[in-house]
């Protein structure tokens, strides 16, 4: 889970960003994601979100962002409407100091 908002900020260099984007793009390719595929992002505002967006763009796929407050039903309808090939999420995150799970909504 991402750390609570009272934690120090995380900084990365452009070189680190490029490395992370390339690793993520290669991971997507290994899942069979190709140019034109839609990839659903069901994540809070964490550093991995822009990394995922850049990796998706790098391979020519299309990212679709879904608000992390949606329930499993709301998420499912958006996945179907977008015809997403892959859904990327996190275990959970903190909102207003309370942990909120996300992965169970995808499962």
From Swiss-Prot:
Origin superkingdom: Archaea
GO process annotations (BP): acetyl-CoA biosynthetic process
GO MF assignments: acetate-CoA ligase activity
Matching InterPro entries: AMP-dep_synth/lig_dom, ANL_N_sf
Protein name from the UniProt record: Uncharacterized protein in acs 3'region
């Amino acid at each position: 889970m991402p750390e609570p908002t009272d934690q120090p900020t995380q900084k990365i260099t452009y070189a680190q960003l490029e490395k992370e984007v390339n690793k993520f793009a290669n991971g997507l390719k290994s899942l069979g994601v190709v140019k034109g595929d839609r990839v659903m992002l069901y994540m809070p505002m964490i550093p991995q979100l822009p990394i995922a967006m850049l990796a998706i763009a790098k391979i020519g796929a299309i990212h679709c962002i879904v608000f992390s407050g949606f329930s499993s039903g709301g998420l499912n309808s958006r996945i179907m409407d977008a015809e997403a090939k892959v859904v990327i999420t996190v275990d959970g995150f903190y909102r207003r100091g309370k942990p909120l799970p996300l992965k169970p909504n995808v499962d």
